[in-house]
């Protein structure tokens, strides 16, 4: 973790900064909840659920909207040059009608440890960390009424659809 954190910090520039570094390690309660939920919802063993989690270590880069695609490409190239492997990319910044818009990547360190690296615009990060987070937390509670859950999902989509789409965002892919 210290090597990856240090390397990612070295890639920062004006307009491309790491955000929320204090939250890079998934909390113990959050991890336990995810293992329980995944083992139940995906009908897998607790061990299989634990082995499938790759965001115990997670980072977030905030990139300027206008230069998002170029900065993503620069950071990716620097990571790959240093021996990191891009495993997968989920780009919902190019989508509408979704509850969350961002770019979530899974990278593997040179020694084989997988971690998550999210990329956001200033607007998508602010939305994710504030209003969307509150709505998401309520929506995922088992006791949330289905009608209320549907209202929450509609509101998250409405908010996410209001975000600006970075130019050339379709170039952000594996």
What annotation goes with each model-predicted range?
Residues 43-174:
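Long beta-strand-rich cores associated with HINT superfamily self-processing modules
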Residues 1-42:
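Intrinsically disordered, low-complexity polar/charged tails and linkers
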């Amino acid at each position: 973790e210290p090597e990856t954190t240090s390397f990612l910090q070295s890639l920062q520039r004006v307009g491309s900064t790491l955000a929320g570094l204090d939250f890079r390690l998934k909390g113990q309660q959050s991890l336990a909840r995810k293992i329980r939920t995944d083992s139940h919802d995906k009908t897998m063993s607790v061990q299989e659920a634990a082995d499938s989690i790759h965001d115990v270590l997670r980072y977030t880069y905030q990139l300027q909207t206008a230069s998002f695609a170029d900065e993503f490409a620069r950071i990716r190239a620097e990571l790959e040059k240093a021996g990191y492997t891009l495993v997968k990319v989920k780009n919902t910044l190019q989508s509408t009608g979704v509850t969350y818009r961002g770019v979530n990547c899974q990278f593997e360190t040179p020694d084989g440890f997988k971690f998550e690296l999210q990329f956001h615009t200033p607007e998508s990060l602010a939305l994710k960390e504030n209003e969307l987070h509150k709505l998401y937390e309520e929506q995922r509670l088992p006791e949330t009424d289905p009608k209320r859950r549907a209202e929450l999902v509609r509101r998250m989509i409405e908010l996410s659809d209001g975000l600006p789409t970075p130019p050339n965002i379709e170039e952000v892919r594996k």
